[in-house]
A protein has these predicted regions:
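Membrane-embedded alpha-helices and immediately adjacent juxtamembrane helical segments
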Residues: 1-291
């Protein structure tokens, strides 16, 4: 197992050597910033349709009350919920297009990590790939809203109840993120790569992302003034902190995708890499012949 892990890590390192993963993650983050609010509007409005507006308001309010105080996002969540429930359906349909931009950004980044040519239609392919996520988003939003009373109650009690609340919310977030990651990984599979291992890898990557999400909640509890580097502009500081978190999240996502591809590529162990390398033509320095 340890030897296999070493083979996967070395293969991923070779594929990423000399390539700008940070730039790719920044590109994905740009598209995410365009899409995250429209996506949240669709998810919350759909959850209200499946449940009720009061169900959504109550769930969001309970989560807002349970989050750390120093940078509590309660007002922002309340405004987002009001917009989601009050926007006419005709106007809400307009948000579907920018919501799919996330899929375009993800596919562009994943294609680069896989070392594949993007192609002229990569943007539309990514948006179409993300449509199932949009369709599922109301259902995925119901899970944290339905468990808000339980989890928020555990969060605020301290001690072991808080631990169990974090454990419960981690698994809820993991299943939600895993569903999205599996769709994205399967939809972006390079030619010749089986989708089954990519979906399995998506669940492992989702566990890391869910843990990172909970780390961000811990970051919210640190009483730092985010506005200091921006001349005291509170909104700018908060938005910049969120964008930085999204950027780091996408770095982890792209790394996880590369490791998943390398795990599939090296499934036969180091011998699989040697066999693949033996197929690569080599030129004899003496004769100049290709062997």
């Amino acid at each position: 197992m340890i030897r296999r892990a070493g083979v996967v890590l070395r293969d991923a390192g070779r594929e990423l050597r000399g390539r700008d993963l940070s730039l790719w993650a920044a590109g994905v983050t740009f598209f995410a910033v365009l899409a995250v609010v429209p996506l949240a509007l669709v998810a919350l409005r759909g959850a209200a349709f499946l449940g009720s507006p009061e169900f959504v308001r109550h769930g969001v309010s309970r989560w807002a009350d349970a989050l750390p105080d120093p940078h509590g996002p309660g007002p922002a969540l309340s405004a987002l919920t009001t917009a989601a429930l009050g926007t006419p359906w005709t106007a809400l349909l307009v948000t579907l297009l920018p919501a799919t931009f996330y899929g375009e950004g993800l596919l562009r980044g994943l294609v680069q990590v896989a070392g594949q040519p993007a192609g002229a239609l990569v943007g539309w392919r990514g948006r179409l790939m993300f449509v199932p996520v949009l369709v599922l988003s109301p259902t995925l939003a119901i899970a944290p809203l339905a468990t808000a009373d339980t989890v928020a109650g555990l969060y605020t009690r301290g001690g072991w109840p808080t631990f169990w609340g974090i454990t419960l919310s981690f698994h809820i977030d993991w299943l939600i993120i895993a569903s999205v990651t599996a769709i994205v990984f399967a939809g972006s599979a390079p030619r010749g790569v089986r989708r089954g291992p990519l979906v399995a890898g998506a669940f492992a990557v989702a566990a890391v992302l869910a843990g990172f999400f909970h780390g961000f909640l811990l970051f919210l509890a640190i009483p730092l003034d985010w506005s200091v580097p921006f001349g005291g502009l509170v909104v700018v500081g908060a938005v910049s902190a969120l964008i930085l978190w999204l950027y780091l999240l996408h770095v982890l996502l792209l790394l996880g995708y590369r490791l998943t591809l390398s795990a599939e590529r090296t499934q036969l162990g180091a011998g699989g890499i040697d066999a693949e390398a033996s197929k690569t033509p080599t030129r004899s320095p003496a004769s100049g012949q290709v062997h």
